[in-house]
């Protein structure tokens, strides 16, 4: 009503500003052209995996656009940020957005960690060689580390993982100072009450060991 009456109302929306000045930015650490090429291949393969699955089993679904919309975040993270368990410290904890699992499968196939048979049986697990719809450590214990579906649970569990890492360090049980928790949240997922309810915990505990993007 105020806006309709011509009253100037402040908004929380601000123009995009790069927080790093151009003269302070370093060179990209990787082979940008090669990474772009691999990124394009992964994005295509993820879409084809879902399309093929629906061709043979009508209505099986698969969230064809989730990975495509946020794939830059995950690919740069995998190439340059996420730390595995074989490096210094305990490694990072990556909670994948569940609907983006086709993209993670596509990359794993490109790396030779999944077979053609696996890819051809996306969302068809009864035969024994299929791939689960979402990150599911019980169904695929050698592939997925953390569950992140139903929608909203990933954000909540990621925050509690970050808090638990801090607890382990403060109690002298494990040195988790180098470990980071990563979670990429979908825009629709942010409407789930579970997603937002634990943000107060992260703020109250001062958890600077978790990175969440939307």
Q: What feature does the model see in each segment?
A:
Residues 1-22, 89, 97:
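Terminal amphipathic helices with adjacent charged low-complexity linkers/tails
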Residues 30, 34-42, 46-56, 67-205:
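Cofactor-binding active-site loop characterized by glycine-rich and histidine/acidic residues
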């Amino acid at each position: 009503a105020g806006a309709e009456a011509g009253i100037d109302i402040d908004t929380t929306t601000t123009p995009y500003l790069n927080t790093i000045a151009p003269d302070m930015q370093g060179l990209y650490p990787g082979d940008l052209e090669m990474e772009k090429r691999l990124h394009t291949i992964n994005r295509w393969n993820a879409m084809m995996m879902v399309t093929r699955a629906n061709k043979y089993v009508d209505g099986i679904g698969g969230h064809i656009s989730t990975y495509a919309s946020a794939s830059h975040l995950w690919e740069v993270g995998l190439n340059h940020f996420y730390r595995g368990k074989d490096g210094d410290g305990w490694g990072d904890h990556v909670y994948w957005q569940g609907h983006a699992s086709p993209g993670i499968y596509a990359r794993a196939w490109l790396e030779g960690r999944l077979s053609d048979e696996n890819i051809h049986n996306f969302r068809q697990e009864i035969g024994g060689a299929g791939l689960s719809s979402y990150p599911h450590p019980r169904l695929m214990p050698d592939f997925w580390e953390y569950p992140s579906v139903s929608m909203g649970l990933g954000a909540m569990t990621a925050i509690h993982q970050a808090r638990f890492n801090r607890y382990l360090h403060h109690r002298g049980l494990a040195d988790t100072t180098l470990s980071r928790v990563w979670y990429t949240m979908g825009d629709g997922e942010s409407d789930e009450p579970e997603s937002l309810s634990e943000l107060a915990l992260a703020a109250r505990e001062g958890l600077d060991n978790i990175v969440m993007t939307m």
